[in-house]
């Protein structure tokens, strides 16, 4: 994390007039820069959630957020010149639409990857389904647990009683930590 911060400062030795950050993880990692060299530089944070990990260890561990390991985004941001654009999930509305279009659905398959935002979204869909759709079964299909080939096999086995929500499916290839969509051709 410190290396990423150093790389940003080395790449941009002159403080910018403003910074746009996409996603809470990018903000949590780069916020210390705004405590020092870029203090008071305006920030626009896109796709933020109401709560964020209380520390980087929680973010990097990719564990579900709880009241104990997270804080309200307003609290985290109180010392910064920041505007937050929240991104709602619309999970309940999506599930209502699926039920309206396919009333025979008894199970929801949720496709996601191993990134932090997918962990948070899986947590949110579990909560919404337990509260508002208790008679729907949830099946989580995650790139950290199954391969792309297994995902495709699973999807082809579904009948009309399964609704599918695709959220994300990024896979890491090799040790270079670069992520690619798994349907891209590798050279």
Predicted regions: what is each one?
Residues 1-187:
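Short hydrophobic alpha-helices and adjacent helix-cap/hinge residues
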